[in-house]
Amino acid sequence: MAGVLALACAAEGAFAACNTPATQVTDAALTTLLSGNTVCAARGGDRWQEEHQAGGALWDYKLGDADPVDPRTQVGTWSVTEAGTASVVTYDYGTGSQSYEIWDDGGSYSFCQAGVVNVDNATVVSGINVGCP
């Protein structure tokens, strides 16, 4: 799927959401934010909803379990490195991994690499197998 975070590497914006006044999500707070929850994001015409299963499995909700054409499926793995301001979430879709800092801008989130926004305005929905609004 073209919308997965690993394929979203072109810079979406400048430095605005990868520094203050946004707050970097670090250490255990990063694991708490993602584990057992769904990240909802969009860029251009692509939209995705990735479920961060406890234990590290990463699922794309797509159109849900009941959809015969585009059901939810595992797309890779995720993990968190808790290291203060060097804390990152790493995604592996089977073709190599990508690591991102996550910045909280008041309830929407930016996924950043080297201070550059790759995905912005992402939201987190509580739970898995719930889809995004």
Task: Give names to the regions the model predicted.
Residues 13-75, 81-133:
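Lipid interaction determinants
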Residues 2-10:
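Bacterial N-terminal signal peptides
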